[in-house]
Amino acid sequence: MAHKKGQGASRNGRDSESKRLGMKVGAGQRVSTGSILVRQRGTKWHPSQNVGRGRDDTLFALVDGIVVTKKTDRTYISVLPE
């Protein structure tokens, strides 16, 4: 056992708080207007029909309905009204 901490040991031990990004609702789930569908940095998922995009690229539902994802060259998320 070392009787001294060693160089740099006192400078370690930090980590950033997780930002809880990602899909908040899965495909096929029912959502209400204003529900957050995805939290993201940049546009990993793109808004399609009845989906809005916030300043921080958050996707949210513009109508009540069911979430649908579609993957082509990009992944699109839409909400089909009920």
Curated annotation (Swiss-Prot):
Region: Disordered, residue numbers: 1-54
Record GO biological process: translation
Gene Ontology CC annotation, any one: cytosolic large ribosomal subunit
Intrachain disulfide bonds: none
Keywords: Ribonucleoprotein, Ribosomal protein
GO molecular function: structural constituent of ribosome
Transmembrane segments: none
HAMAP family per UniProt: Ribosomal_bL27
Family recorded in the similarity comment: Belongs to the bacterial ribosomal protein bL27 family.
Name of the protein in question: Large ribosomal subunit protein bL27
Organism: Chlamydia caviae (strain ATCC VR-813 / DSM 19441 / 03DC25 / GPIC) (Chlamydophila caviae)
